[in-house]
């Protein structure tokens, strides 16, 4: 007997139930209205906030800026008037920010250390770094990691 991962079985079962009409259609669910309150300019026309995370304790958004290789920090304690309050330069740790996440009292960014290619032009995996900093942008540590 062929074994399927649990997630595959769940998806197949849910699909079958939807087809059979046994699950409520999304149209029957309560609707959610989203209203824009404000927007934040992420740069001077160069770079953009590709990946962002929110830290509730500091009321700040931390966003990757791949062009500048930084994590930009935005204070949204006054939601109607957000402002950029700083950035963390990641060039000392690597050359390509790939992710950011916030939790407790720290923020973690992941960076590639170098872009390496084989003789045939195929990208090769190199060790990367994680950069741990506080919500004010002060770097606390930067241990090596594998497979970034």
Which residue stretches match the model-derived regions?
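Mobile, glycine-rich extracellular loop/lid and propeptide segments
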Residues: 28-148
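Gram-negative bacterial Sec-dependent N-terminal signal peptides
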Residues: 1-26
């Amino acid at each position: 007997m062929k074994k399927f991962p649990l997630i595959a079985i769940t998806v197949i079962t849910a699909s079958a139930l939807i087809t059979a009409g046994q699950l409520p259609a999304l149209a029957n669910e309560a609707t959610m209205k989203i209203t824009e309150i404000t927007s934040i300019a992420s740069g001077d026309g160069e770079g953009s906030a590709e990946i962002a995370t929110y830290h509730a304790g500091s009321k700040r958004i931390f966003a990757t800026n791949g062009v500048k290789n930084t994590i930009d920090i935005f204070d949204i304690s006054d939601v109607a008037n957000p402002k950029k309050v700083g950035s963390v330069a990641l060039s000392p740790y690597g050359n390509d920010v790939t992710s950011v996440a916030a939790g407790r009292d720290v923020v973690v960014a992941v960076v590639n250390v170098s872009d390496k290619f084989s003789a045939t032009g195929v990208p090769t995996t190199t060790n990367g770094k994680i950069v741990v900093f506080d919500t004010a942008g002060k770097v606390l540590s930067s241990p090596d990691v594998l497979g970034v």
